[in-house]
Amino acid sequence: MIEGLKVKALICVVEIIENGINSIHAMGILLFALNILKKASVLVSRILCAWNGKLSSEYPRDPRSRLGIFKNMNIAFICDGNRRYARKLGLEDSFIKDKGLQKIYEFIEFGCFYGIKEISFFCFALSNFKRSPEEVNKLMGLVKQKIERPKEIGIRPKFRVYGRLDLLEEDVRKRLMDIEEESKNNTSIIVNIFFAYSAEDEITRGIQFNSHVDILIRTSNTKRLSNFMIRQVAKGTSVFFAKALWPELTTAHLFLILLKHRLENKYLLG
């Protein structure tokens, strides 16, 4: 029954409330509407649990399905689980990390489609330098070879890079800085890349990232922040721990996570 439920049914619920909640005066009707929203939120939660790791990358692409429900949101990801996914499938880490990188572009496209204002990815922690030199070198090689320039993506994101770039090899640092420079006038969506980064280090060196974040999503069901977005969470950023590993997370997962957040925060808590 849960698997047969269409995402569009939930969108219809949101659309009804979006169009009518401001004009509802009868308290009984209002409570009824809020009860529907609460049940819809619970259904979204159940779908996320039932379909964890199994959702396709399909989501409503019809412009009429957008409704502006995610417009101007600021979302962030802790991209965790690449190595576990590689072990799970018996594949090379480098292949999986490439897949994980493509997942970033997939979510940037999703964000552009739904009018998300800002999207952040925690890709490489400062503490990751403690990993084996071989693993670190493979990741740096992936950055040099696979990160696409803004003009090659097909959309026009504005990239911002945060972290200790001074600790990176010169060619890796130049690659990241070039992407930031080339996209500085783009306006479709702001994409923040956190590389060689930790929140504690940022505070020590002076605050750089000050944007309010609506929701922080961490994959792999690891319930910790890993020194990321600490100030934002302390100031009210919602946190969602997804069971799916980073390469398993799909745009359908993301759609439902954001819809759940929207239902709860705009109508049930706000």
From Swiss-Prot:
GO terms for cellular component: endoplasmic reticulum membrane. It is found in: Endoplasmic reticulum membrane. Its EC number is 2.5.1.-. GO terms for molecular function: ditrans,polycis-polyprenyl diphosphate synthase [(2E,6E)-farnesyl diphosphate specific] activity. Keywords: Endoplasmic reticulum, Membrane, Transferase. One of its GO terms (biological process) is protein glycosylation. It is a peripheral membrane protein. InterPro entries: UPP_synth-like, UPP_synth-like_sf. This is Dehydrodolichyl diphosphate synthase. It comes from Encephalitozoon cuniculi (strain GB-M1) (Microsporidian parasite). The lineage of its organism: Eukaryota, Fungi, Fungi incertae sedis, Microsporidia, Unikaryonidae. The gene is RER2.
